[in-house]
Amino acid sequence: MIREIRKVGDPILKTKAKKVEKIDEKVKELARDMIETMKFCNGVGLAAPQVGESLRIIVVDYEDNPIVLINPEIIEMSGEELDYEGCLSVPGVEVPVKRAERIVFKAQDLDGRTKKYRAKGLLARVVQHEVDHLDGMLILDRAVEETLKTEEK
């Protein structure tokens, strides 16, 4: 089922999401809905708070293969990269955001197994962006102000 994307101003987007304690059918259904919603909206990632659920679940589109990450935790970061990001919860806006170039993170899959992942480039950026959502942060909170320019006449 495609779910409504919560937009900037919705309090759930500024709230730290709760850890998933049990991976039951409700969590699996939410994950399926999140994948369907992400694809419908042409997104590359989606966090549960963006569809109104305060749970630490994200989905990312990796080479057209959606991955569900439950209770993701970034454990290593290296390098730094500045690039523009958009967000389904902040429509029509792109802002420059500094992110780690490479990350190591762990998360549970839908079977409850904890796995360790290494990511770089776009995948690393998407995972960091979605984990920010779980911590109540939006791209507007991370925008690099010195790179924002206004047109002067």
UniProtKB/Swiss-Prot annotation:
InterPro entries found in the cross-reference section: Peptide_deformylase, Peptide_deformylase_sf
EC number: 3.5.1.88
GO process terms (BP): co-translational protein modification; translation
CDD domains: Pep_deformylase
Keyword Zinc-finger (UniProt): no
Cofactor(s) needed by this chain: Fe(2+)
Reactions listed under catalytic activity: N-terminal N-formyl-L-methionyl-[peptide] + H2O = N-terminal L-methionyl-[peptide] + formate
Residues spanning the membrane: none
Domain of life: Bacteria
A Pfam family reported for this protein in Swiss-Prot or TrEMBL: Pep_deformylase
UniProt-annotated binding residues for Fe cation: C87, H129, H133
Record note on cofactor: Binds 1 Fe(2+) ion.
Active site positions: E130
Keyword entries, A-Z: Hydrolase, Iron, Metal-binding, Protein biosynthesis
MF terms (GO), sorted A to Z: metal ion binding; peptide deformylase activity
Family: Belongs to the polypeptide deformylase family.
Task of the protein: Removes the formyl group from the N-terminal Met of newly synthesized proteins. Requires at least a dipeptide for an efficient rate of reaction. N-terminal L-methionine is a prerequisite for activity but the enzyme has broad specificity at other positions.
Record protein name field: Peptide deformylase
